[in-house]
Regions:
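Extended hydrophobic/aromatic segments used for targeting, binding, or gating
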Residues: 219, 225, 230-239, 243
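A short structural micro-motif
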Residues: 80, 98, 111-118, 207, ...
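Winged helix-turn-helix DNA-binding recognition segment
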Residues: 100-104
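Bacterial N-terminal signal peptides
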Residues: 7-15
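Acidic, glycine/proline-rich low-complexity segments that act as flexible tails and inter-domain linkers
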Residues: 20-69, 82, 89, 93, ...
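Short, structured motif recognition centered on aromatic/hydrophobic residues
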Residues: 71-79, 108-109, 198-206, 235-239
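Intrinsically disordered, low-complexity segments enriched in Gly and acidic/Ser/Thr residues
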Residues: 207, 213-214
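Bacterial N-terminal signal peptides that target proteins for export
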Residues: 1-5
Length: 267
């Protein structure tokens, strides 16, 4: 009996060690900055190959202000928003290897159809389909078309609807209608993404698109849903490489204002 218990205990130890090694391996996974190989990049621009290796692979993706999983989500959202299908395909693979599920990626594309436009989402669909086929992802691994929705925060929805009606009701009644349903009464209530993740990809897409006027509302919503100040700042850092320095610097003052206002309200 003692030998059986000892063997069971040893099995648990080995299992825990293996799981720890797997987790550590994921955390230390080398992220290639592009679908294009470093050798091919070097054949055109040795400096670009060096910056990609030193700044992106060896520095940016090793920073701990965002988890590898969240960093890949942010990057996929930014690339979809900027309609970069070749790089979307590469980073869909990175995201899957970093712990993002096929269901979450499916829902990210759905969400960004509204925030980056249908054509950008269709570009993402075409390349993601190929990745899913290669990895054997089947339809039953994807979110339902019409699932049971998350509970609605009635007070927040009332405030949102009144603000939208006041600001654009006379200008575009159709925009008011579709902003309510399907955007906030359906899309935002779908359970395939947590509210935090849904806000995370929205903020990332807005920063990547240079839509600074919309960042404040959605960043506040993201932080209400659990995004930290450090994570918010790191999204801007990630944007510098994947959406360009001008977009990062356009977003930085808006993000800073949100962080200052939230900090002041707590004192």
């Amino acid at each position: 009996m003692k030998s059986v218990l000892a063997a069971a205990a040893m099995s648990l130890v080995i299992s825990d060690f293996a799981n720890a090694e797997e987790t550590r391996g994921k955390a230390m996974m080398k992220i290639e900055p592009s679908a294009i190989s470093e050798a091919d990049i070097r054949s055109v621009s040795p400096a670009l190959a060096r910056f990609g290796r030193e700044a992106i692979t060896e520095d940016l993706w090793t920073r701990d202000a965002l988890s590898p999983r969240d960093r890949s989500v942010v990057t996929v959202a930014m690339l979809i928003a900027r309609n970069q299908p070749a790089e979307v395909k590469h980073y869909i693979d990175v995201a899957l290897d970093s712990g993002v599920t096929p269901a979450e990626l499916s829902e990210i594309i759905t969400h960004l159809a509204f925030y980056s436009g249908w054509p950008n989402a269709m570009s993402a669909v075409s390349v993601t389909k190929a990745v899913f086929e290669t990895r054997g992802v089947t339809p039953d691994a994807l979110p339902d078309a019409s699932p049971d929705l998350l509970p609605l925060n009635q007070e927040a929805e009332k405030q949102r609807s009144e603000t939208v009606e006041k600001n654009v009701g006379r200008i575009s009644p159709g925009l008011v209608k579709f902003t309510a349903d399907p955007l906030f009464l359906d899309l935002w209530q779908r359970p395939a993404l947590t509210p935090r993740d849904r806000s995370l990809i929205t903020v990332s897409a807005l920063i990547a698109s240079g839509q600074s006027a919309q960042i404040g509302y959605h960043l506040n919503r993201a932080m209400d849903n659990g995004l930290s100040a450090e994570e918010a700042g790191e999204i801007v850092t990630q944007a510098a490489f994947y959406a360009g320095w001008p977009n990062a610097f356009t977003a930085a003052p808006v993000v800073g204002e949100v962080l200052i206002n939230r900090s002041s309200s707590k004192t």
